[in-house]
Amino acid sequence: MKEKRFLRLNPSRGNFLAAGAVLLASAVFFILEWPLALEEDASGQQRLCWWYVLAFSGLGALATGICLLQFDLPGAARQAIGWLLVLLLPLSTFVVVDVINGTKIWQFSGRKWLANYLCYLLVFALAYALTRRPWAAVAIGGAASLTFGIANYFVVQFRGQPILPWDLTSFGTALTVSGGYEYVPTRKMAVGALYYICTVAFCVKVAPQDAPHASRRFHIAERLAALSISGLLAITLFPLNGLSYLDISVWAWNQKGSSELIGIAASFFANAQYMMVDTPDGYSARA
């Protein structure tokens, strides 16, 4: 009797194209940004940055390999793994974004970790509610978070403070002004981007593309559950002032310092919360 394996190599045309695209993109980036592979030692001499070379090449090879694999799993197992990835990946995304921005993440208390995790989970839950597919939620949530983190890094470099909620009202002006700056990616950005590609590729392979055996009622219930979680998180973070209970507060006069001490996402969400100021009793615009 032939033993059934849940993991096997699947050299199909689509898999080869995906693997080739990942390999080509990572190789082109490595060549174009080759200075990232070098660093100066204490004497000022150039030497190979081993951690970057190993991390970049390792993640590139891993992403390429994942594209060539096929996971033969039961539908229920795929569904469970998909939900688990949507719940766990916001945590790793938080780590990637804060490492890119150089916050004091490894000194954060458990409450601050939870606060940042909930902020990212809100984004992923919204993406899942819109698409009802784990791989799409991971792709959209991860891309939005990583883009925000990279943009925040450059904004801090240019003006000395992070992205703030009210900056979104002048987004067009910011795009016009940003054309005059030079953007040089960092090693952490490159490694973070490849990690994101690995997670999306793994989720596409493992999580269900769709559940044809599931009823329409199940699909509706699944979407409503994701919307309910998103709504509950939004209410907890904003009207109920949940962030303050998790030791999250910002200094209006030192936004950069605040974001380094409490996390990029938590700092942004806390500032957004402060914009929702209740109208004082007896206030009248005509007065």
Predicted segment positions?
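Extended, compositionally biased non-globular segments that define protein topology
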Residues: K2-W166
